[in-house]
């Protein structure tokens, strides 16, 4: 995983050049939105348990067969594994958000996840629905500006939405 700064430096170094004005401007934009990015990650981190729990409840209300005998989330052990996996995805989405880059999400969470779920018989479509529900909850939190400094966070909202969409597509 390389953050935006490391990527820019690595690219310039590979070419044996100084950073261009365009690259410097891009890095300045990242710095200027840094506090907003931290606010987004803090909201998700501070509400992670509720995001995961409420998404799971909504999923199981829509798909009760998952928690019925023989379902993929039936028994407390399987339910715990489901909640753990949802929390891991949410955590890596927050890592991608703070880094401003999806590679940490891809490399450490999503690569091979679909194949793992297929091997375990876990319905990827249901996991994708759970991720969508976490996305909806996270976006509602991020869009709630109560108690946070005013500022346009539309680009960050769109960015975090893409990380959730990427995760859902990876398992579907």
UniProtKB/Swiss-Prot annotation:
Gene3D superfamilies: Phycocyanins. The keyword Zinc-finger does not apply. GO terms for cellular component: chloroplast thylakoid membrane; phycobilisome. Keywords: Antenna complex, Bile pigment, Chloroplast, Chromophore, Electron transport, Membrane, Methylation, Photosynthesis, Phycobilisome, Plastid, Thylakoid, Transport. Contains one covalently linked phycocyanobilin chromophore and one covalently linked phycoerythrobilin chromophore. The modification N4-methylasparagine is found at residue 72. Signal peptide: none annotated. CDD domains: PC_PEC_beta. SUPFAM superfamilies: Globin-like (SSF46458). It is a peripheral membrane protein. (2R,3E)-phycoerythrobilin binds at residues 35, 39, 149-151, 153. Its main location: plastid. It comes from the Eukaryota. (2R,3E)-phycocyanobilin binds at residues 72, 82, 84-85. It is found in: Plastid, Chloroplast thylakoid membrane. GO terms for biological process: photosynthesis. Coiled coil: none annotated. The light-harvesting antenna system in red algae and cyanobacteria is formed of phycobilisomes. These are composed of the phycobiliproteins phycoerythrin (CPE), phycocyanin (CPC) and allophycocyanin (APC). Cyanobacteria also contain phycoerythrocyanin (PCC). The phycobiliproteins all share the same subunit composition and organization with variations in the covalently bound open-chain tetrapyrrole chromophores. Belongs to the phycobiliprotein family. Heterododecamer of 6 alpha and 6 beta chains. The basic functional unit of phycobiliproteins is a ring-shaped hexamer formed from two back-to-back trimers contacting via the alpha chain subunits. The trimers are composed of alpha/beta subunit heterodimers arranged around a three-fold axis of symmetry. The phycoerythrins also contain a gamma subunit which is located in the center of the hexamer. Light-harvesting photosynthetic tetrapyrrole chromophore-protein from the phycobiliprotein complex (phycobilisome, PBS). Phycocyanin is the major phycobiliprotein in the PBS rod. This is R-phycocyanin beta chain. It comes from Polysiphonia urceolata. The lineage of its organism: Eukaryota, Rhodophyta, Florideophyceae, Rhodymeniophycidae, Ceramiales.
């Amino acid at each position: 995983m390389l953050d935006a700064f490391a990527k820019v430096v690595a690219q310039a170094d590979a070419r044996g050049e100084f950073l261009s004005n365009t690259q410097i401007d891009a890095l300045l934009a990242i710095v200027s939105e840094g506090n907003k990015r931290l606010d987004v990650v803090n909201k998700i981190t501070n509400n992670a348990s509720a995001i995961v729990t409420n998404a799971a409840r909504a999923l199981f209300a829509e798909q009760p067969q998952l928690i019925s005998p023989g379902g993929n989330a039936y028994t407390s052990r399987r339910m715990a594994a489901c909640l753990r996996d949802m929390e891991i995805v949410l955590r890596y989405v927050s890592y991608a958000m703070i880094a401003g880059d999806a590679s940490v999400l891809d490399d450490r969470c999503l690569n091979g996840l679909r194949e793992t779920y297929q091997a375990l018989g876990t319905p990827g479509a249901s996991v994708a629905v759970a991720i969508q529900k976490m996305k909806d909850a996270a976006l509602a939190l991020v869009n709630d500006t109560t108690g946070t400094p005013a500022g346009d966070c539309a680009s960050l909202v769109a960015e975090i939405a893409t990380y959730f969409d990427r995760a859902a597509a990876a398992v579907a």
